[in-house]
Every structure is written in C-alpha cells, then in structure tokens.
Amino acid sequence: MRCDRLWRNARLATCAPDRPGLGVVEGGAVASRDGRIVWAGPEAEMPSLEAAETIDCAGRWITPGLVDCHTHLIFGGDRSGEFARRLAGESYESIAREGGGIRATMRATRALDEAAMRAGAEARLAAWAAEGVTTVEIKSGYGLDEATELAMLRAARAIGRAGRFRVAATYLGAHTMPPEMDRAAYLDLVCRRMIPAIAEAGLADAVDAFCEEIAFGAGEVAAVFAAARAAGLAVKLHADQRAEGGGAALAARFGALSADHLEYASAEGIAAMARAGSVAVLLPGAYYVLREAKRPDVAAMRAAGCRMAVATDCNPGTSPIASLRLSAQMACVFFGLSFEEAWLGITRHAADALGLGGECGAIDAGRSCDLAIWSVDSLDQVLAWVGPAPLERRVLKGVDA
C-alpha cells in the first residue's frame, strides 16, 4: 500500500473509540495518504507500506491534534478592567447591566472591519498552534447586528480556508440583546432573516444561544433552535451557567451537539442530554475567572454516560484564557476529571461536540490525519505542567502546520 507519510517508532494515544482508555499503542506507527489516515497501530502489525516520506519519531508520543470546541476568538476591544471590578465586589450581572460585559465587546467589535477581525483572531491563534490544537470552534455573537455578525462568520471561514486550522463556525446571534432593538424585533431578525441567510451562504455549521436570565429565556431559545433546525443547522447552547434554567433539558429536546457550562444543570437535565447524545462541554476558565462556587455535576454526567468535553471559552471578559492545556488541567483540579477524561475531553469528545466525530479527534483509519507530536516521556507531562507546551510538531490533514 502506498502512503504519503509514515510516522514510525512512536507511542500513540489514539483516543480511538474501538480501543480502551486512551487507546495507547507502544511501538506504534501512523500512515497517511491525501491528508487522511490509512493505517494506525502497532508497527509490528503494520502492512507493507511504500511511503514517500518516513519520519522516525524516536519514541515520542503522538496524540490526535487537540480540539477546542468553544471559543469567542473574534472580538474587538479590551475588558481587562472588569477583572478588577469583580475583585472589588461587582457581579457579572451588574457589570453587564451597566453596559459592560458582552455589550462593551459589541461596541468595539462593530468598529472593526472584516480584515481586522481575521487578523486579531489569527494573532491569538498562535497560542493554540503552539499547544497542538488543530481544530477550533469560533463563534460570532459580538456584533448583534446583521453586518457585524456576517463579517465575523466570514472572518472565521477565511481563517479555516487559510489552512492552519480546521475551523467550525457557530452563529451566536442570541448572545444578548442589542441596545437599539426590542426583543421581538431582534428575535425576528435572528430567526427569520439571519439564520436562513447564514445557512444559505454556508457561513456557519451550528447555531448557539445564551439561555440565562440576563440573556434569553427557554422559550426564546426554542424559537431560535426551531429556526436553525428548519434551516438545516445543528444547535448548541450556553446552558445553566448562572442558575438552573432548564437549559440542559432544552438542549436535549433539540438534539443539540452540546450544552456548555452546566454548573447548575440538574441531574435530570444531564440524563436527558445523555439520552439525546449531547456532549457536556465544561468551561473551567469561566468558573475560575468569575470565582464561582458551584461546580458542574460531573458525577451525574458519569452516571448518565454523558460524554464530557473541555474547552477554553476564550473571550475578553469572563475567560481570557489562551491555553487548552491549562483548561484541561483546571477541569481535573476544579471539577474532578480524571486524566483520561481530560484527554478525551480535548480530543474525541470535543470533536463530537462540534459534529466532527468521524473527521478528527482520534487517530483512526479514515479520519483526517491531524496529529500532535510531543517531546515527553509521559503524557502526564503535557497536562501536569503549566507553561510552554512540549510540542515537537503539529500536523493538519497530513501536512506539518
């Protein structure tokens, strides 16, 4: 069998669903052709391969390219001052009601043109590349008007076309209310105009919403999701972050790819998510920055068999964190995830949360050849340490990226 590239003499953590745990293979090899994995497994069992290029990994660890399944990477302005305000005792809600929070970023983002949006996000993404991330989700939601939201999604698509990352674009029009419109008019714009136009233009892979008292209620989100499903788009949800508002159950009702945050999600809502196949995306960065006390019910997620992913939630206000490795470590320390759960949470389960479960997130024949090659003796070192990543090489679609 011919292949373009062959990585041999490696230790693999395949994260493949047909292998137990992290799917560890000692003395492993991976072969790719036309950007896809054609074989992965023990080198001793490798079929006869004729490789155009062979890379001796010298015993290094290879994992799937990491997947960050929840980010707000396109934005304007700076909200670092809100950190000091919260330290002084102001709440997230009070800052938002006084024109800070999402609306502050909205004003700054509306002032950017599409080129500036793309340039800012690409500069930030250098930190993700340095950590072996190959797939990233990018949301809109900081424009809250037609022109800016479309520009954000076009910028996200342009970043994906540039080839350094696989980008899943998500329309988050129902993030908060823009100040210049009333609720009925804005929801009508989102549901009747924006979602159909975005779907027709292929600008988004999914539609997200923020289901909280300070944003949108369950009935309003249901209308947004109905419009998304009618347009053929998947749905995701910011759910039960600040209070139990039935977000997890709502996500399950619409067969959402994921529900994210979930600090206040009920055990019943989590069980409904598991039955619906929705992934629970844990966002410990926001929990940390907001100094929350309520943790997601990880025990209920385990008991229900609900897959767990971990993401940065990178945004300029409540999770200004540019490290998926740190987020995974936080999920272990703050939320009690195991080492295995954390790794699956930033690989296979994160891909599932984007509807990309058959495409990336595991080293498995037929998937895209997205790899992270680590200069470590043990995978423990990748998540145990905070700071520069011990990354040797990052591969996207079979090519060094």
UniProtKB/Swiss-Prot annotation:
Main location: cytoplasm
Biological pathway: Amino-acid degradation; L-histidine degradation into L-glutamate; N-formimidoyl-L-glutamate from L-histidine: step 3/3
EC identifiers of the protein: 3.5.2.7
Record note on cofactor: Binds 1 zinc or iron ion per subunit.
Keyword Metal-binding: yes
Keywords on record: Cytoplasm, Histidine metabolism, Hydrolase, Iron, Metal-binding, Zinc
Localisation per UniProt entry: Cytoplasm
Cofactor: Zn(2+); Fe(3+)
Binding site for N-formimidoyl-L-glutamate: 142, 315, 317
Gene Ontology cellular-component terms listed: cytoplasm
GO BP term, pick one: L-histidine catabolic process to glutamate and formate
Role summary: Catalyzes the hydrolytic cleavage of the carbon-nitrogen bond in imidazolone-5-propanoate to yield N-formimidoyl-L-glutamate. It is the third step in the universal histidine degradation pathway.
Protein known as: Imidazolonepropionase
Organism of provenance: Acidiphilium cryptum (strain JF-5)
